[in-house]
Design a protein with these regions (language model features):
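N-terminal metal-binding scaffold of metallo-dependent hydrolase/deaminase domains
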Residues: 1-39, 374, 378
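Active-site gating loops and adjacent loop-to-helix segments of metal-dependent hydrolytic enzymes
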Residues: 83-94, 137-160, 203-220, 227-241, ...
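Active-site core of metal-dependent hydrolases
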Residues: 159-280, 380
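His/Asp/Glu-enriched, well-ordered alpha-helical/loop segment
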Residues: 229-242, 260-272, 278-356, 360-363
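Alpha-helical scaffold segments that flank or form the walls of functional sites
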Residues: 51-53, 60, 70-123, 146-159, ...
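C-terminal cap of metal-dependent C-N hydrolases
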Residues: 7, 341, 351-383
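Divalent metal-dependent hydrolysis catalytic cores, especially in the metallo-beta-lactamase
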Residues: 63, 79-108, 123-136, 160-171, ...
Length: 383
């Protein structure tokens, strides 16, 4: 077994001091007071002075980083992402496809399924997030209109063992049969790239127990006092769990705070929506066959349309706390536990508890920068 001593430990509800985190490859074995810690049973003891121990982050919406993209026709792309993500505190993720030609989406989902069976090291792939191609042309964002198609569950059915989330525009559906098929298959419906009215969403989503909202505020009908739109529905429907890109580019700090006040600690999931340019230098990049220009923390198409982000999860957690006043346990839960709960994996992932996977991140207590990442009890990144 191994142990982390002298760190603060973030649990679901509080931050512990004077405790030791004991773990091995099979999971977290103990969270015990320093006075009761038996050091002789541990082969490695890490001094966590100046660090905060948090559960590994789970990123449910990420297109790429480190120069690669989920849509790349490259069998090594996912392995590269899995290897680099621990640098950002991510220990599990959903590779996210985008609105592309159907053969390319099929190939990407096939690669994801194969990788899930073969993966050995790095961040865990928990399944796929399909962002499109069943979206609205009005709010397509950085996705190509020519690749948008009508929703057809037969396109997803061969991959129901892989797809965990599908982003779509509900107003483009002729009826609720597609949504019912997703519910039956255990696939989370996420409203995004949608021009739906508040009333149309209420009609279409009536049969769902819960749903997600893809990057709240972005690429969807906005909140107006007479036309609440997707944003109004998301903020007022208790079933809705909302993704937020907290890079202060996609969302004004006040918009982040509004979401936090409306949705509470359980209704927000922090994401990055990052593209291949994340963890690379400023300059020209690519997304979905389109040129992207990156400067500092902003990624845009030539016409100024935001094109994903270059945000990391650790930075998103820091900004979310600063902008909303959320506590450290609340911000950490938004980047870990809330995702695990939605995916039905909170018995294994999402919080530091005895019996759960030893997916642990040590953050600098002053800057929240990632200093060490542990996956299944093995250190995979150390700054």
């Amino acid at each position: 077994m191994e142990a982390i001593i002298n760190s603060r430990i973030v649990t679901k509800e509080t931050v512990l001091t004077g405790h030791v985190l004991v773990y091995d490859e099979s999971g977290i074995q103990q969270i015990v007071s320093t006075d009761n810690f038996q050091a002789g049973k541990c082969r490695v003891i890490t001094d966590g002075s100046g660090y905060i121990a948090v559960p590994g982050f789970i990123n449910e919406h990420i297109h790429g980083l480190g120069g690669v993209d989920v849509m790349d026709d490259d069998p090594q792309a996912l392995a590269i992402m899995a290897k680099r993500l621990p640098e950002t505190g991510v220990t599990a993720f959903l590779p996210t496809t985008m609105t592309y030609d159907l053969p390319s989406i099929t190939r990407a989902l096939t690669r994801i399924r194969r990788y899930m069976k073969e993966q050995r090291i790095g961040a865990k792939v928990l399944g796929a997030h399909m962002e499109g191609p069943f979206i609205s042309d009005i709010y397509k964002g950085a996705q190509k209109s020519t690749h948008i198609v009508k929703a057809d569950f037969s396109l997803i059915e061969p991959f129901i063992d892989t797809v965990r989330i599908v982003t779509l525009a509900p107003e483009t559906l002729p009826d609720n049969s597609f949504l019912e098929a997703c519910k039956k298959a255990g696939i989370i419906v996420s409203v995004g790239h949608s021009a739906a009215t508040y009333e149309k969403l209420a009609e279409r989503l009536a049969g769902l127990d819960h749903y997600h909202v893809t990057h709240l505020y972005n690429a969807q009908s906005p909140l107006h006092h007479r036309k609440p739109g997707v944003v109004g529905a998301a903020l007022t429907d208790e079933r809705a769990v909302c993704e937020l890109i907290c890079d202060d580019v996609h969302l004004h700090p006040a918009a982040q705070r509004l979401a936090y006040i409306a949705k509470g600690r359980n209704g927000i999931i922090l994401i990055t929506d990052s593209i291949r340019a994340c963890l690379t230098e400023n300059g020209e990049s690519e997304l979905g066959g389109q040129k992207v220009f990156v400067h500092e923390n902003r990624a845009e198409l030539a016409d100024g349309t935001l094109a994903g982000s270059v945000l990391t999860m650790a930075d998103g957690v820091r900004r979310f706390m600063h902008n909303t006043g959320a506590s450290l346990p609340e911000a950490v839960a938004a980047a870990s536990l809330n995702v695990a709960v939605s995916l039905g994996l909170d018995h294994q992932l999402g919080s530091l508890e005895v019996g759960k996977a030893a997916d642990i991140v040590l953050l600098d207590e002053d800057t929240l920068q990632v200093k060490k990442t542990i996956i299944d009890g093995t250190t995979v990144f150390s700054a």
